[in-house]
């Protein structure tokens, strides 16, 4: 073998060695969303040592506050590192909750956490409609077929506009609001929370163990740390 060929062969061998020794790119757990058989959404590493489940209501101010305060530390310090898998389930307190829950679940699974966040971020805007609603409005929300009631709520609360800003067409929204199977899956999550014995929102469990009396990120975070 000539010196030139020997050098080329050694260079290729060295390149192959370096390539095989290079560390694998870290998994972007913040982009990893899975859906359980029950229809709830999980963000992060499904094999994380800690599984946090939050039961929330979209009309609940404390839930919106939890989402706001916990968002950065939960995602960056725990979910992104693959240490915590974050699951969201629904507790329905009224027809408005049910409508928003169907909208957050609308579309591909990857859209859920973005939809979930925007309805909490804008809760102060749309919740005013509930406080100032008229008797005739409330009648529209509770009479007629299921889809018609949800469409009335979506119209009165300007949810169509919120979803359009998220890239949805009105026909997409109406299809999700008419999805009875989705409504049943969401209602089953509420039934599960009642069976567990949760009495307020937000409520939490860690690795399947209910955290009764824990309602805030300040109370929750030390308990997450204790499992890591």
Per-region residue spans from a language model:
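Cysteine-centric redox/oxidoreductase cores and disulfide-bonded domains
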Residues: 92-200, 205-209, 214-218, 225-228
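Extracytoplasmic thiol/disulfide redox context detector
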Residues: 2-98, 190, 194, 227-228
């Amino acid at each position: 073998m000539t010196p030139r060929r020997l050098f080329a062969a050694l260079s290729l061998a060295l390149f192959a060695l370096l390539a095989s020794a290079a560390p694998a790119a870290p998994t972007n757990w913040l982009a990893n969303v899975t859906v359980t058989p029950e229809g709830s959404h999980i963000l992060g590493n499904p094999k994380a040592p800690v599984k946090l489940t939050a039961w929330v209501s979209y009309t609940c101010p404390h839930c919106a506050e939890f989402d706001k305060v916990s968002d950065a530390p939960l995602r960056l310090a725990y979910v992104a590192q693959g240490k915590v898998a974050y699951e969201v389930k629904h507790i329905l307190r009224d027809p408005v909750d049910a409508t928003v829950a169907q909208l957050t679940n609308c579309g591909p699974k990857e859209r859920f956490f973005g939809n979930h966040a925007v309805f909490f971020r804008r809760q102060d805007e749309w919740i005013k409609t509930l406080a100032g609603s008229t008797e005739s409005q409330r009648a529209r929300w509770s009479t007629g077929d299921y889809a018609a009631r949800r469409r009335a709520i979506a119209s009165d609360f300007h949810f169509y506009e919120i979803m359009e800003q998220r890239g949805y067409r009105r026909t997409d929204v109406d299809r999700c609001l008419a999805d009875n199977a989705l409504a049943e899956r969401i209602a089953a999550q509420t039934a599960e929370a009642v069976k567990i014995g949760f009495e307020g929102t937000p409520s939490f469990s860690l690795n399947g163990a209910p955290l009764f009396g824990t309602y805030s990120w300040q109370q929750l975070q030390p308990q997450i740390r204790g499992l890591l």
